[in-house]
Amino acid sequence: MNRAEEPYTVKEALLFSQRMAQLSKALWKSIEKDWQQWIKPYDLNINEHHILWIAYQLNGASISEIAKFGVMHVSTAFNFSKKLEERGYLEFSKKLNDKRNTYIQLTPKGEEVFLKILESYDPTRNAVLKGAQPLHQLYGKFPEIVEMMSIIRHIYGDDFMEIFEKSFSNIENEFTSEEGKMKKKQEAKEAGESIEVDKPLEPLKN
């Protein structure tokens, strides 16, 4: 590759990539700690909670979709999904017109746990939120991190970002804050699901 053709120098590339790497590492250490503390009362790990989150949003996600949107290996997605199934939080199924792929759905018990976790969220125990508060005080809103989202889009693709945006749009539209806690709106409860399933599912037979 002819580096002279690049619109940046090797030095600029190194400085940027290492800034991103080291800042991301520092940020993840804080995020990981807070995330683990949040879900600890429910005896879940981060991958398991992420799977519940994706299953709630997609309401019929394949294992490959769980792996893609959860940024984990397919075997990791499958193994943790099986553990969640054993606890009664997920059920495995097949689409009637797609017998090759295995899909997962939240059970009523799984949805109940997912909603309880959301309700238990405590902003005072989130270090990243605390770190962003000076910016909120200055600008009247939290950072929209559009530059980071653009980078992620170019790494993982439009599908990834579409599901990412949809999941937070669902939270925005279906939940409200009541007395300092997250609560699902009554009309969303009556609707019965977050995202409409486009193809019928049938349970897997053991």
UniProtKB/Swiss-Prot annotation:
Family matches, as InterPro entries: HTH_MarR-typ (IPR000835), HTH_tscrpt_reg_Hpr (IPR023488), MarR/SlyA-like (IPR039422), Tscrpt_reg_MarR-type_CS (IPR023187), WH-like_DNA-bd_sf (IPR036388), WH_DNA-bd_sf (IPR036390)
GO biological process, alphabetically ordered: negative regulation of DNA-templated transcription; response to stress; sporulation resulting in formation of a cellular spore
Positions of region (Disordered): 177-206
* Residue range(s) of DNA binding per entry: 63-86
Q: Which keywords does this Swiss-Prot/TrEMBL entry list?
A: DNA-binding, Repressor, Sporulation, Transcription, Transcription regulation
Q: In the UniProt record, does the keyword Transcription occur?
A: yes
Mind telling me which SMART domains this protein's record contains?
HTH_MARR
- Compositional bias per record (Basic and acidic residues), positions renumbered to this chain: 178-206
Q: List the disulfide bonds.
A: none
Question: Looking at the Swiss-Prot or TrEMBL record, what is one Pfam family this protein matches?
Answer: MarR
Domain annotation HTH marR-type: ranges:
13-157
Annotated signal sequence is none
GO MF, one term, reads:
DNA binding
At the top level, the lineage of the source is Bacteria
Quaternary structure, per UniProt, is: Homodimer.
Job description of the protein: Negative regulator of protease production and sporulation.
Name of the protein in its database record:
HTH-type transcriptional regulator Hpr
Gene name of the record: hpr
